[in-house]
């Protein structure tokens, strides 16, 4: 049955792996900037993005001024506290995602959205480049109504920018309220800092997000 399972097809909750009640252990500090991996300072906000393999996505965001911390994990699915191996089966419903804690006085949520749209291909469905499966889908998981509004508005602007550039593909990015974010195993946290020559499939399509009118 596993051999015939199509990892590009979304699953329902009744088909998801059971997972576990025990959360994944999380390192206390981010290895790049030594900030807390879990705490959100009072004046900061959280965003969650999925853009394919989370290794390159996490690096993209930790390099941005105003980003306090980043974490690789899983979001948008059903299985509680999944392992990486479980997510790779396509039977958890989760996407590989990155949790971004940021200071809105330094970098705004719309600026993070610009990084999101311009640094991956949001029109590939259940894949990102050579990485194939529902875990690699493009998604924005919103935590406030303001984030949801901004995400949907930027979606429309980027879709029009693609059309204007001669790209007639439809955006497949999933925009929905964030469910639980489950931290990935420690080996996946800040992976490209620990493994500078590691795999990074991140890349845009050469289209820029136009300024908000």
From Swiss-Prot:
<feature type="active site">
    <location>
        <position position="53"/>
    </location>
</feature>
<dbReference type="InterPro" id="IPR050162">
    <property type="entry name" value="MsrA_MetSO_reductase"/>
</dbReference>
<feature type="region of interest" description="Disordered">
    <location>
        <begin position="1"/>
        <end position="20"/>
    </location>
</feature>
<dbReference type="GO" id="GO:0008113">
    <property type="term" value="F:peptide-methionine (S)-S-oxide reductase activity"/>
</dbReference>
<dbReference type="InterPro" id="IPR036509">
    <property type="entry name" value="Met_Sox_Rdtase_MsrA_sf"/>
</dbReference>
<dbReference type="Pfam" id="PF01625">
    <property type="entry name" value="PMSR"/>
</dbReference>
<comment type="function">
    <text>Has an important function as a repair enzyme for proteins that have been inactivated by oxidation. Catalyzes the reversible oxidation-reduction of methionine sulfoxide in proteins to methionine.</text>
</comment>
<keyword id="KW-0560">Oxidoreductase</keyword>
<dbReference type="GO" id="GO:0005737">
    <property type="term" value="C:cytoplasm"/>
</dbReference>
<dbReference type="GO" id="GO:0036456">
    <property type="term" value="F:L-methionine-(S)-S-oxide reductase activity"/>
</dbReference>
<dbReference type="GO" id="GO:0036211">
    <property type="term" value="P:protein modification process"/>
</dbReference>
<dbReference type="GO" id="GO:0034599">
    <property type="term" value="P:cellular response to oxidative stress"/>
</dbReference>
<comment type="similarity">
    <text>Belongs to the MsrA Met sulfoxide reductase family.</text>
</comment>
<feature type="compositionally biased region" description="Polar residues">
    <location>
        <begin position="1"/>
        <end position="12"/>
    </location>
</feature>
<dbReference type="InterPro" id="IPR002569">
    <property type="entry name" value="Met_Sox_Rdtase_MsrA_dom"/>
</dbReference>
<protein>
    <recommendedName>
        <fullName>Peptide methionine sulfoxide reductase MsrA</fullName>
        <ecNumber>1.8.4.11</ecNumber>
    </recommendedName>
</protein>
